[in-house]
Curated annotation (Swiss-Prot):
It comes from Bacillus subtilis (strain 168). The gene is ywoC. It is an enzyme of class 3 (hydrolase). InterPro entries: Isochorismatase, Isochorismatase-like_dom, Isochorismatase-like_hydrls, Isochorismatase-like_sf. Keywords: Hydrolase. This is Uncharacterized isochorismatase family protein YwoC. The lineage of its organism: Bacteria, Bacillati, Bacillota, Bacilli, Bacillales. It comes from the Bacteria. Belongs to the isochorismatase family. The keyword Hydrolase applies. One of its GO terms (molecular function) is isochorismatase activity.
Length: 189
């Protein structure tokens, strides 16, 4: 049985990870952006804080280049000029708070934690791409920083069902609550 969500939109932020032109094509279901947009609309309705997060690099020299057994998916080389732009369907508006991260997690090397704390936010609703990379890294950082978390499972995706399910089954239950978009929207009415 799921615990009821007691959402105070003045203390809760929606954090959307990497819904940008170069990453959204990973979502084979096609449901991540529409579901995230429903969340954006709900947060806007309640004047809730939304953080749109993307990943970008200045010139490539600032990107990590670890020696690994499995190269990063997506290959290497120069990214298209619009690779880091948010997809227009998500509805980023002038004046919205955006974060550009240089690593997997949205907290490391950014002012996201500072901005959330200054607004009195203690809970984040998290969605985006990729479940087991940018989203999970952000979730782990948020957990270590003491935030309560709600993961919107059908507003996130990754390279394979196996990777997605591993995070949903083994990581998220230890650090927060998981809901679908409709479950979340129903519970905040």
């Amino acid at each position: 049985m799921m615990n009821t969500l007691n959402i105070d939109f003045q203390k809760t932020a929606l954090v959307i990870i990497d819904l940008q032109k170069g990453i959204v094509p990973i979502d084979q279901s096609g449901q991540v952006v529409p579901n995230a947009k429903k969340l954006v609309d709900e947060f806007r309705k309640h004047n809730g804080f939304i953080s749109f997060v993307n990943v970008a690099f200045h010139d490539g020299a600032d990107a990590l280049k670890p020696q690994t057994d499995e190269p990063a998916q997506g290959g290497s080389g120069e990214m298209p000029a619009d690779w880091a732009e948010f997809v227009p369907e998500i509805g980023v508006q002038d004046g919205d708070y955006t974060v550009t991260k240089r690593q997997w997690g949205a907290f490391f090397g950014t002012d996201l934690d500072l901005q959330l704390r200054r607004r009195g936010i203690d809970t984040i609703v998290l969605c985006g791409i990729a479940t087991n990379i940018g989203v999970e890294s952000t979730a782990r950082e948020a957990f270590q920083l003491g935030y309560q978390q709600i993961f919107i499972t059908d507003a996130m995706s990754t390279f394979s069902d196996e990777e997605h399910e591993a995070t949903l089954r083994f990581i998220f239950p230890r650090i927060g609550k998981s809901r679908t978009t409709e479950e979340f929207l129903e519970q905040v009415k």
